[in-house]
C-alpha cells in the first residue's frame, strides 16, 4: 500500500508543477535542413605568368608556354613590341610602377588581362587610376607586397641634379597611387633604379659635364622626401643619364651628331657629391 501512496503523491506533485508552469512551448521542432553546407573556397594557387611592358607602352600578361613558342621581338626587330621590362611573375604578386611625376602605382598582376604575345596589351592609362596624360613609367618591379622590404634601397635622380635614397619597405603602401618622391616645381624625375652592390653613381648632363661620387654619401630618407643635391646643374643644362659604376666598368659616350668615345671607369675621378662636375666631352662647332 505504501507504493500506491507514493505514486499518488508523485502524481499530485507533477500536476501541481504542470499547472504552475503551464504555458506554450518555447522552442520549435523543425525539419532538418538537408541543403549542403557552404564551405568557403580556398584561394586558387598562384599561377606563373610572363608580364611584359613594351616600347609602345602596353602591359601584357602572357602564358609562359605561349611565350616560349612566340617570344617578343628584340629591340632591333621591333622597338615598339620589344619588352622594356620583362618579368617571370605569379598572380599573387604586384607590379610597382614608378613614373616621371614621382608617383608609384601598385598594380596586382592578377588584374591584368591575359593575351597572346602578338595581341595588343593594356595601356597604362587604362589600368592606372589617376595617371596624368603626360606621365610616363620610368621603372617597375614585380614582387609580393609582403616581400617588398627584401628589395634593395631605391634611388631617384632628377633632371636638376637631386638624388633620393629610400628603403624599399617604405613603398609597402596599400593605395592605388601614392607619392614616391617629392619632385620640386620645375624639375622632373629622370631615373629610378635599385641601389645595386655597386660603389658609385655617375651622372652626365646634356652639355657633357659628368660627376662621379660614392653611393655611401647619399643618406637614406623617407618616402616623401625631396632628396639631396648630387650635382650643381647650370641654367639651361640638365642631367640626361645616371647609372651605377664599378672600377671594372667601361663607358661609351655618343653625341647626337654621331661622335663616340669609350672610356674606362677609372678615367672618371671620384668627387664629392654636390659638385659642378667635369667635362667628359668637348664639342666643337660640328658637334
Residue ranges of model-derived segments:
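C-terminal interaction appendages of subunits in large macromolecular complexes
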Residues: 1-287
Amino acid at each position: 500500500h505504501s507504493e500506491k501512496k507514493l505514486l499518488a503523491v508523485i502524481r499530485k506533485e507533477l500536476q501541481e508543477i504542470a499547472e504552475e508552469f503551464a504555458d506554450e512551448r518555447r522552442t520549435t521542432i523543425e525539419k532538418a535542413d538537408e541543403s549542403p553546407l557552404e564551405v568557403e573556397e580556398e584561394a586558387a594557387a598562384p599561377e606563373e605568368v610572363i608580364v611584359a611592358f613594351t616600347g609602345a607602352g602596353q602591359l601584357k600578361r602572357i602564358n609562359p608556354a605561349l611565350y616560349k613558342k612566340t617570344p617578343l621581338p628584340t629591340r632591333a626587330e621591333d622597338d615598339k613590341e620589344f619588352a622594356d621590362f620583362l618579368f617571370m611573375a605569379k598572380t599573387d604578386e604586384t607590379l610597382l610602377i614608378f613614373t616621371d611625376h614621382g608617383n608609384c602605382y601598385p598594380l596586382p598582376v592578377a588584374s591584368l588581362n591575359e593575351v597572346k604575345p602578338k595581341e595588343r596589351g593594356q595601356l597604362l592609362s587604362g589600368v592606372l587610376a589617376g595617371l596624368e596624360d603626360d606621365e610616363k613609367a620610368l621603372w617597375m618591379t614585380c614582387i609580393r607586397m609582403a616581400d617588398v622590404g627584401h628589395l634593395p634601397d631605391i634611388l631617384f635622380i632628377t633632371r636638376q641634379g637631386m638624388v633620393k635614397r629610400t628603403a624599399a619597405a617604405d613603398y609597402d603602401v596599400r593605395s592605388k597611387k601614392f607619392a614616391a618622391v617629392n619632385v620640386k616645381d620645375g624639375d622632373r624625375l629622370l631615373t629610378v633604379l635599385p641601389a645595386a652592390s655597386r660603389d658609385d653613381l655617375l651622372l652626365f648632363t646634356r652639355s657633357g659635364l659628368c660627376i662621379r661620387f660614392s653611393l655611401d654619401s647619399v643618406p637614406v630618407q623617407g618616402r616623401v622626401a625631396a632628396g639631396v643635391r648630387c650635382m650643381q646643374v647650370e641654367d639651361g643644362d640638365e642631367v640626361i643619364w645616371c647609372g651605377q659604376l664599378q672600377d671594372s666598368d667601361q663607358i661609351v659616350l655618343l653625341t647626337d651628331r654621331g661622335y663616340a668615345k669609350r672610356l674606362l671607369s677609372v678615367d672618371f675621378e671620384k668627387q664629392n657629391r654636390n659638385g659642378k662636375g667635369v667635362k667628359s666631352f668637348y664639342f666643337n662647332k660640328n658637334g
